[in-house]
Curated annotation (Swiss-Prot):
Cytoplasmic topological intervals: 24-309
Annotated PANTHER family: DDRGK DOMAIN-CONTAINING PROTEIN 1
Self-association state and partner proteins as the record states: Interacts with Atg9; the interaction is transient.
Membrane topology: Single-pass membrane protein
SUPFAM superfamilies: Winged helix' DNA-binding domain
Family: Belongs to the DDRGK1 family.
One Pfam family named in its UniProt record: DDRGK
Transmembrane portions of the chain: 3-23
Main location as per UniProt: endoplasmic reticulum
Annotated protein name in UniProt: DDRGK domain-containing protein 1
InterPro entries: DDRGK_dom-contain, DDRGK_domain-containing, WH-like_DNA-bd_sf, WH_DNA-bd_sf
Coiled-coil regions, chain positions: 120-177
Amino acid sequence: MDLIILVGIAVALLVVIVTLYLLQKKNAAPETKVAAAPQRGVPQRAQEGVPRRAQIARNQRNRLRQNVPAAPVAAAAGALPAAGDSDHEDEGQVDGDEARVPQGAVLDEKMGAKKRAKMEAKEQKRLQREQELHDREQRKVKEAKEEAERKQQEDLEAEAERKRVDAERLAKEERERKEHEEYLKMKAAFSVEEEGFEEGDADDQDNLLADFIQYIRDNKVVVLEDLAVAFKLKTQQVIDRIQNLQADGTLTGVIDDRGKFIYVSEKELLAVAKFIKQRGRVSIAELAESSNNLINLTPISAGGGEASS
């Protein structure tokens, strides 16, 4: 009894298992057909889950960008177009499109663009800093050049001022030297010459000079040769004495081309100046005619008049 029950249970379980197996096989057959049928417009490699060559190369480039330092980035970027061209050739053999690129690859591409933008920004800042340094150096060079030119101009001005001061000093010394020489000449002119008076004391020389001046004032018009004979001097010595006396203001007058000295007193000169000032513009003929009335040329002493004639 027990054996029959066990056999019946075993047969029932076997029937159930066979039935479930047949049902499962029946349901799995349509799905297998659908999966086995190739998808139109989708590459076979994508249907099989194998990554495309272009995607593999792109992933490799992204990993290279992350591992290579910033300096060789530019060199690596130059080699990328060649790999890109081969990728496009491989993609031409595949009938797929970029719409089915995995999401991870897109994220890697975006990360590379951000890093590239960051590196470009750093490069831009570096170039800007170099430009600022260059401008600063140029400005320093320009300022140094301007400072050197300014200093050179100041040196030139100082040198010119020094030369001007030296020239004024030399001119003053020369003027003083000439004045001293003229004084010595005037002093020597009144010394007794070999053919003149015998050497006397200082009082005699002063008296002789006073007589010389008074003689000219009394005679008004004197012949230089006669004056030299009267005082036992040479004619050139007489001329030198008269010029020295004119220079210091003791005598006023003119030496004409006939060898005569015409003495004109300061009072007579003032009268002539007053006449010219009153008349305004005066011709030489009018001045000569009026001078006969303004200037008295008559000798004071008769003896002096005979000598002058």
